[in-house]
């Protein structure tokens, strides 16, 4: 897997998050006969024309590019379902609606490679983008309320949203542990540091001449 973009804050790039999402299973309808495919991640197929089967997203994209299958969009990508989710997201400022962990990346890959297989594609894309924007706004707003808390629980966040929150949480925990350090430890560290400085500043004993 690609290395982390910034090791200090453990932030992944959008390309890295999308790469990890490509292991999600999606349903396709093959238009060819093919024997079972064996991978480290599992066995997929065999593939029979017009018989739906589930494969990793990366494999589905590869088959689609070769004209070997069509996609069956996941149920959550329907206009009706996305409209309900968007309304619920707007109504609540403190909770997030349940969506696949990689919903943004899955939708983006389907828009790029299987737009002809998605009913009302432009409406679906608009709804997904609106949902993403509303959730990001809520997330940014709620981050300010986490100041001074020792524990935070956020349910139903996506991979992209976790990636955004991670740097904030790391910095908050670092500050929490720094300020929560017992005074005894601080005093001990201070004394040790002072003793070290005094030792370093002591005059050196002259060497005895032979």
UniProtKB/Swiss-Prot annotation:
GO terms for cellular component: nuclear chromosome. Its main location: nucleus. It comes from the Eukaryota. Signal peptide: none annotated. SUPFAM superfamilies: GINS helical bundle-like, PriA/YqbF domain. It is found in: Nucleus. GO terms for biological process: DNA replication. Keywords: DNA replication, Nucleus. Pfam families: PSF2_N (PF25005), Sld5 (PF05916). Gene3D superfamilies: 1.20.58.1020, 3.40.5.50. Residues 182-210 are annotated as: Disordered. The keyword Nucleus applies. Belongs to the GINS2/PSF2 family. The GINS complex plays an essential role in the initiation of DNA replication. Component of the GINS complex which is a heterotetramer of GINS1, GINS2, GINS3 and GINS4. This is DNA replication complex GINS protein PSF2. The lineage of its organism: Eukaryota, Viridiplantae, Streptophyta, Embryophyta, Tracheophyta.
